[in-house]
UniProtKB/Swiss-Prot annotation:
Top-level EC class as recorded in UniProt: ligase
One CC-aspect GO term: cytoplasm
Encoding gene per record: dltA
Protein name in the entry: D-alanine--D-alanyl carrier protein ligase
Listed GO MF terms: ATP binding; D-alanine [D-alanyl carrier protein] ligase activity
Residues annotated to bind ATP: T152, S153, N292, T293, Y294, G295, P296, T297, D383, Y394, N395, G396, R397, K492
UniProt lineage: Bacteria, Bacillati, Bacillota, Bacilli, Bacillales
Pathway, per record: Cell wall biogenesis; lipoteichoic acid biosynthesis
Signal sequence, renumbered to the chain: none
Primary site of residence: cytoplasm
Its EC number(s): 6.2.1.54
Length: 504
């Protein structure tokens, strides 16, 4: 598959087909090509001998998709940065990535960034001034060059830039379209922010098949009335989201085949799909296929998939995450470094062309988890699991990195920022489960000196500081105050004891 050529052919074959919809804004395939060509031409003229990544800032604006394609046509990887990401984190991404340019689809509220900022109005001028100019196709990202870089949580307090190459993305997109039987011209739900790699599961499968991306933004999700009004208008046929989002939608009785009569495929990734959620979806959408997938950001979104049928639901209380894509393979590694036999738990290791080339500018971190096996790139996921008859079963994290509502995070990073807060002497973050999956984060805090009379006021002050450093989804929901952190006999934090206090 030639990814960019495949997207561009729709500008010729179906130029007036809508490529992307967000509220009242939409772009056609013709506009997508013209504007991304104009932008790529401008980037190449401004940065002729430069291949540094480009930050793309915004939320669900159509310009985001134009900017992504404009970057890669000019030979630059893009770094998606959502509006919800705090200023401090945006600053660290800008500094660590070596980016020289930021393209914005919305007002940039972060100050003193060490990059050139191209505003929304600047972009409109570029689209107009450079209209009709086409970039040199030889300059476009290809092969093992980076296509996008997504920043994920890092245990040192600094986010890690996962480098995904053109070849990685082609392998993923081809597999998604073929294995999940996606058709030409379908409407895809775009629920995940672009800085979350789940969004890649809808963006590129939609664009290469001439589909329409129907974007749902965070304000709609916060107002269910607006959300369901948008869904009713959408005629979505391919649903891509975390299971949690679908579970939230199922609380609305009208969320069913009557609302979305042409629904064909549900693609789930990012967290555990509970058996009962899949069962309800089959009841509400009997003609749709429910697909459960698994994969870390470091292996390009997902590498396994399974069609969840009623037979699968009856057979497995905890659902399998699927069979590996044909160009990759899974190894289950025991602690001694040997490969575990069928049915035995160990660390999931992914081998093949889906695997990232590593973390941008972090060779030491890269060496810890990326390796070569039989001449192919391999990634040690840190996830526990086992394989039985070719089916992968996921058993949570081996360390303290978790998935919460689809977002991956390292508890150590949250603890790092908690301990840096003014009123905190010590802190531990404990993830609290509800059923099979994590429901919220609890912060256990040893407070420093303060003058607050009530604990809730202290909590508000700590949360205010955290809001300046971390995305909202990484901020603990509940706080508990202790005079000291309990320890195990071998000197480690006694997380089990803390957990028992909460669940008692």
């Amino acid at each position: 598959m030639k990814l960019l050529e495949q997207i561009e052919k729709w500008a010729v074959e179906t130029p007036d087909q809508t490529a992307f919809v967000w509220r009242d804004a939409k772009i056609t395939y013709k506009q997508l090509k013209e504007d991304s060509d104009a932008l790529a031409h401008w980037i190449s003229s401004e940065y002729p001998d430069d291949r540094s990544p480009i930050m793309v800032y915004g939320h669900m604006q159509p310009e985001m998709i134009i900017n992504f394609l404009g970057c890669v046509k000019a030979g630059h990887a893009y770094i998606p940065v959502d509006l919800s990401i705090p200023a401090d984190r945006v600053q660290r991404i800008a500094e660590s990535s070596g980016a020289k340019l930021l393209l914005s689809g919305a007002e940039v509220t972060v100050t003193d960034l060490p990059v050139r900022i191209t505003s929304e109005d600047n972009l409109k001028d570029i689209f107009f001034t450079h209209k009709g100019n086409t970039p040199n196709p030889e300059h476009a990202v290809k092969g093992d060059e980076n296509f996008y870089i997504i920043y994920t949580s890092g245990s040192t307090g600094n986010p890690k830039g996962v480098q995904i190459t053109y070849n990685c993305l082609v392998s993923f997109t081809k597999w998604t379209v073929e294995d999940f039987n996606l058709q030409t011209g379908q409407v895809f739900l775009n629920q995940a922010p672009f800085s979350f790699d789940l969004s890649v599961m809808d963006i590129y499968p939609s664009l290469v098949t001439g589909g329409t991306l129907w974007a749902i933004d965070k304000d709609m999700i916060a107002r269910p009335k607006d959300l369901f009004a948008s869904l009713e208008q959408s005629d979505i046929q391919v649903w891509t989201s975390t299971p949690s989002f679908a579970e939230m939608c199922l609380m609305e009785a009208s969320f069913s085949e009557s609302m979305l009569p042409n629904m064909k495929t549900f693609l789930f990734c990012g967290e555990v799909l509970p058996n009962e959620v899949a069962r309800k979806l089959i009841e509400r959408f009997p003609k749709a296929a429910i697909m459960n997938t698994y994969g870390p950001t470091e292996a390009t979104v997902a590498v396994t998939g399974i069609h969840v049928t009623e037979e699968v639901l009856d057979q497995y209380k905890s659902l399998p995450v699927g069979y590996c894509k044909s160009d990759c393979r899974l190894l289950i590694m025991k602690e001694d470094g040997t490969i575990a036999p069928d049915g035995e738990k160990g660390e999931i290791v992914i081998v093949g062309p889906s695997v990232s080339v590593g973390y941008l500018g972090s060779p030491e971190l890269t060496e810890k988890v990326f390796t070569m096996i039989d001449g192919e790139r391999a990634y040690k996921t840190g996830d526990a699991g086992y394989v039985e008859n070719g089916l992968l079963f996921y058993n949570g994290r081996l360390d303290f990195q978790i998935k919460l509502h689809g977002y991956r995070m390292e508890l150590e990073e949250i603890e790092h920022h908690l301990r840096a807060c003014s009123y905190v002497e010590g802190a531990v973050v404990v993830p609290i489960k509800k059923g099979e999956k994590y429901d919220y984060l609890l912060a256990v805090v040893v407070p420093g000196e303060h003058s607050f009379e009530k604990e809730f006021k202290l909590t508000s002050a700590i949360k205010k500081e955290l809001n300046e450093r971390l995305p909202n989804y990484m901020i603990p929901r509940k706080f508990m105050y202790h005079s000291s952190i309990p320890m195990t006999p071998n000197g480690k934090v006694d997380r089990k004891k803390l957990l028992s206090e909460v669940t008692a």
